Amino acid sequence: MKDYYAILGVSREASQEEIKKAYRRLALKYHPDRNPGDKEAEERFKEINEAYAVLSDPKKRAAYDRGHLEAPEYRPEDLFDLFFQEVFGVRGHRRPPRGEDLEAEVEVELQDLLHGAEKEVRYTRLVPCEACGGEGGRRTPCPTCRGQGVVESYRQSFFGTVVTRTACPHCKGRGYLLAETCPACRGRGRVPREERVRVQVPPGMDEGHLLRVPGYGNLGPGGPGDLYLRIRVRPHPHLERQGPDLVYRLRLGLAQAALGARVEVPGLEGPIPLDIPPGTGHGEVFALEGGGLPLPGGRGRGTLRVVVELAVPKKLSPKAQKLLRAYAEEVGEEVAPEGFWERLKGFFRK
């Protein structure tokens, strides 16, 4: 994964204002118009815009910081639009804007992450209103900007006349006003619609990972945005996840721990036999290599760690008590005398 902070030359703790300032400085320095024919500067410009597109969005930045964001893909026109918007305050080349990106959740079972799985996700996105064709109503050109969406202001400087283009405040950069509002969408031009999309969840995905589905965000005049699916892993009844490794807490009886036993532990592909050697103590760990989840880059699988927890019985039958007392006497361990606790309880009841 690229280091977007290094690309912009800022620290991981940088504020949004510091990130924006660094972006503007670098974007102006490496803009293709200032470096004609320089392929290296062109690639640098793309990287700078890609880094800013992620770090300027709080949600994407948080996911990136956790290592849960897939490498985004941007069209060249998107990067130039971002440059014009952030540096000059207007959209470059007057290209219609894409729809907004969306975020939804996809729930998976722990077993799904072993080989990957196809999942269907339901979510709601905005689509063009059929009643008005997505126009929001009957349009009329904005008289302030004459349908251009931008206004120009002029000022004299030492270098001559400086022209500044900004979004038209009257129509908010749209270039038109609504003479009549569509009742179906109330002038918004878009209406919500429930959608379904089937996605392939790759093996070994982390909890909270953002899975990008291009073109399934809100629809806008310039095309759709993207859909980001946040991975949610349902808790397993027996196994805990620790990265690519799994943990199973095995409760052993005193006799099993002392004498040894053959047990079965739950695995993602079925029960796994495990031989417990005599004299196993509380907290001992047995590592079953390859019993975990897939490692990044197809480098095998993690480990299933079996942690022993001794189950001390709270109640014993008279026969079991007798056997344990005989064992304690054999090994020289001092225990409470027979009937001690009953006599003590009776004392406090008086």
Curated annotation (Swiss-Prot):
Subcellular location: Cytoplasm
Keyword set includes Cytoplasm: yes
Domain J: 3-68
Entry's cofactor comment: Binds 2 Zn(2+) ions per monomer.
Gene Ontology molecular function, alphabetical: ATP binding; heat shock protein binding; unfolded protein binding; zinc ion binding
Coiled-coil regions, chain positions: none
Alphabetized Pfam families for the sequence: DnaJ, DnaJ_C, DnaJ_CXXCXGXG
Gene Ontology BP annotations: chaperone cofactor-dependent protein refolding; DNA replication; protein refolding; response to heat
Binding site for Zn(2+) 2: C142, C145, C168, C171
Binding site for Zn(2+) 1: C129, C132, C182, C185
UniProt superkingdom: Bacteria
Positions of CXXCXGXG motif repeats: 129-136, 142-149, 168-175, 182-189
Cofactor: Zn(2+)
InterPro entries linked to this entry: DnaJ (IPR012724), DnaJ_C (IPR002939), DnaJ_domain (IPR001623), DnaJ_domain_CS (IPR018253), HSP40/DnaJ_pept-bd (IPR008971), HSP_DnaJ_Cys-rich_dom (IPR001305), HSP_DnaJ_Cys-rich_dom_sf (IPR036410), J_dom_sf (IPR036869)
Zinc finger (CR-type): 116-194
Location, primary (coarse class): cytoplasm
Keywords: Chaperone, Cytoplasm, DNA replication, Metal-binding, Repeat, Stress response, Zinc, Zinc-finger
Annotated GO CC locations: cytoplasm
Similarity field: Belongs to the DnaJ family.
Description of its domains: The J domain is necessary and sufficient to stimulate DnaK ATPase activity. Zinc center 1 plays an important role in the autonomous, DnaK-independent chaperone activity of DnaJ. Zinc center 2 is essential for interaction with DnaK and for DnaJ activity.
Physiological role: Participates actively in the response to hyperosmotic and heat shock by preventing the aggregation of stress-denatured proteins and by disaggregating proteins, also in an autonomous, DnaK-independent fashion. Unfolded proteins bind initially to DnaJ; upon interaction with the DnaJ-bound protein, DnaK hydrolyzes its bound ATP, resulting in the formation of a stable complex. GrpE releases ADP from DnaK; ATP binding to DnaK triggers the release of the substrate protein, thus completing the reaction cycle.
Assembly notes: Homodimer.
UniProt protein name: Chaperone protein DnaJ 1
Gene: dnaJ1
